[in-house]
């Protein structure tokens, strides 16, 4: 089965799940992809009672008293040494960090950057457009650069770039699914963006981070560990 055929098959009636994860290959590089159906309980997490969670294990433990199970999670944007978000961060409608629209150093400042918003639907929105007309986001995280903007690759990406890294990002399909991908091999931005546009098939996609990229996906037996991370995005369900 081809990659695109597999994506279609996952969306056939009667086969829908809250989160569906799979492994994939694109241009000899390995990727893991998790798709979140519209209406699922997708949340952002940063702090627990004792400070930043910093890891999937701490988040799983923190959710236990609430009766919720973590079905999928991924690091969700760049952060400072104290794990605070670099850009806009909204949790349960409360803005915890402001939006940053000026250019600057590093990947975050490589404009255009963008915001992933969880509201009545999922959306990836360029940061300045978001600031000009902010939607109602229950959760939102800003990162950068944008990978795909209205079907076009970020103008700064070069196919021949020798900047290779592990990377993760998110895009939104036309049917409303949020599609998260992480590279299991080092890839450059051009390849990563083309994977989202040409294989995943989204018109807008946002880079979340690189090198610290992590995935929690029990379906794939993934529970990545490493240095502490800042914002975490994940799907939760009530325990049976």
Regions found by a protein language model. Give the residues of each.
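Short acidic-glycine loop/turn motifs at beta-strand connectors
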Residues: 36-39, 117-122, 149-150, 172-176, ...
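Zymogen propeptides
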Residues: 17-107
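Conserved, well-ordered active-site substructure
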Residues: 86-102, 156, 160-166, 172-204, ...
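Hydrophobic h-region of N-terminal signal peptides that target proteins for export
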Residues: 9-18
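Active-site-adjacent helix-turn-beta-strand microarchitecture at beta-sheet edges
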Residues: 84-157
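Short glycine-rich loop/turn motifs
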Residues: 29-33, 112-113, 164-169, 229-230
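Sec-dependent signal peptide recognition
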Residues: 1-9
